Every structure is written in C-alpha cells, then in structure tokens.
C-alpha cells in the first residue's frame, strides 16, 4: 500500500503568522525553526500512522513555499521526502499517480477570503464562481483525477469544514480554532500529533469507502488572492479552459511567475 502525505505549514498547531524574512533577528530565526519543528512532528505522526496501518511506501511532499521546511533528519527513516522547488507547472504534487492508495494532508489552511481563518490565501475559482477551492481541496481534485481518494486532513476549523463539505467521509482533524488571520486557539502540539495519528489511521481504514473528489469538465479556472491575507481578493492571471481540473491547473500554473522562464537566479526561500 502506498500513502501520499501532502503538507503545508499554516495549518499546524501553534502556527499563527510567518516570520519576517527581511529582519534577521534572533526572534525571527527562532520563529521559523520553531514552526519547522511543529510541522515535522505532525508529519511524523502521520507517517507513523500510515506505516502502522500497513503501508509499504509513504511519500511526504514538503509543499510549503521553498519546499524546504520539514526537518527531514528527524523524519521516520521508512518514508521518503519530496522537497525543493522545481519551478515548473506540473510539480506541485510530484510522484502522485494512480498507484497511490490514499492521500493524507497535514497543515492545511483555508482559501483566500475565508473570514476568521489563519493566513487564508489561494482561492481557486471554478467555472466563474460556481465553486471555489482551497489549496487543500484543489489537491483533493487533482488526486481525484487519478482515482486517488483524499482520506484525511489536519488544519484549522475553517479548512476542515470546507473539506467535509466537498469530500464526504474524509477524516478532518481540527488542531486549532482560527480566530482571525493571525490569531488562533490551538491544541498543544503533543495533543495535535496524537489526534493526527488517530485520524490518519481512521482515514486509511476508510479508503475504500471514500470516493475520489472528481470535478466534471469542461472547466474554467482562475486564482484569486490578496496581499497580507486580507481582502480584497484580486484575480492573479487569465482564466484558462480545459477538459479536466488537472489540465486547467497545469495551464494556469504554467503562466505564473514561479515557472522557469520568469526566474533567472531563484532564491529558493523566496515566494514566488
């Protein structure tokens, strides 16, 4: 059995806001590494649960920003980690294919414009507003095109609510209640890790009964986002049309600033 673990950092217990990369103070450096540690521990809980559920292979995708956030020296040595930045359109979920039995998501956050949610961003607009997707549910849809069910996620209460609505049966582990863009009422990290472990086991056990999240084409896709994680939202590019969500996503991403033609000397830790 193969399990794919998609990760982000904004949804981990204890995270409320980013460090200031323009200020190399002790507090900012410590904050960044503290968030890395919190993310690593939650990912380790998910990895252990996957192997305890009978997984033969577990892929961990370090998907936040630089792709260099998880302290991989501290990960369970049985898993493999996908990290770094490919600067191309089709590498957001590398190594996710139809051979994967289930996808798990750790550290998820709400879409842009969601009231009272932690650092909300990335609001994917489908068919001119008929549906909106977060990064989390976009990952579910891309996996769905491959026939892979998304069985579990962790994050704040707002992203858990969206995932439950769109993916019936998914196990949603709320590790914090978001109070505003930069404030939360969080579980203590050790408790969050315990619940993530239990949630991953429960989700994997349900993998045959949770249907892949599939969006029927043809589709029109655009991305709305904002500065500083607060409204107003603005369209980030030109609307694309395609037969599947995967094709639409790849076409849109190919037009954005982090693709190869737009970057000469990339700073891997700067986004985009």
Task: Label each residue range with its predicted role.
Residues 90-149, 154-160:
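Internal, conserved structured core segments that host functional sites
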């Amino acid at each position: 059995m193969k399990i794919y673990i998609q990760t982000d950092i904004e949804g981990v217990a204890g995270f409320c806001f980013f460090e200031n990369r323009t200020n190399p103070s002790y507090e900012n450096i410590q904050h960044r590494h503290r968030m890395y540690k919190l993310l690593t521990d939650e990912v380790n809980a998910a990895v252990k649960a996957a192997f305890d559920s009978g997984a033969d292979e577990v892929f961990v995708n370090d998907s936040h920003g630089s792709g260099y956030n998880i302290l991989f020296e501290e990960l369970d040595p049985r898993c493999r980690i996908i990290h770094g930045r490919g600067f191309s359109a089709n590498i957001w979920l590398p190594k996710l294919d139809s051979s994967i039995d289930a996808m798990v998501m750790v550290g998820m956050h709400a879409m842009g414009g969601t009231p009272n949610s932690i650092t909300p961003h990335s609001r994917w607009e489908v068919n001119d507003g008929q549906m909106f997707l977060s990064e989390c549910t976009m990952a579910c849809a891309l996996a769905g095109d491959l026939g892979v069910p998304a069985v579990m996620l962790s994050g704040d209460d707002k992203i858990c609510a969206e995932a439950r609505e769109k993916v019936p049966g998914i196990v949603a582990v709320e590790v914090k209640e978001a109070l505003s863009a930069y404030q939360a009422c969080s579980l203590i990290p050790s408790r969050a890790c315990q619940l993530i472990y239990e949630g991953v086991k429960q989700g994997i056990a349900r993998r045959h009964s949770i249907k892949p999240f599939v969006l029927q084409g043809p589709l029109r896709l655009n991305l709305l986002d904002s500065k500083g994680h607060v409204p107003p939202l603005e369209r980030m590019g030109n609307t694309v049309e395609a037969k599947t969500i995967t094709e639409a996503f790849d076409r849109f991403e190919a037009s954005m600033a982090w693709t190869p033609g737009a970057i000469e000397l990339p700073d891997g830790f700067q986004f985009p």
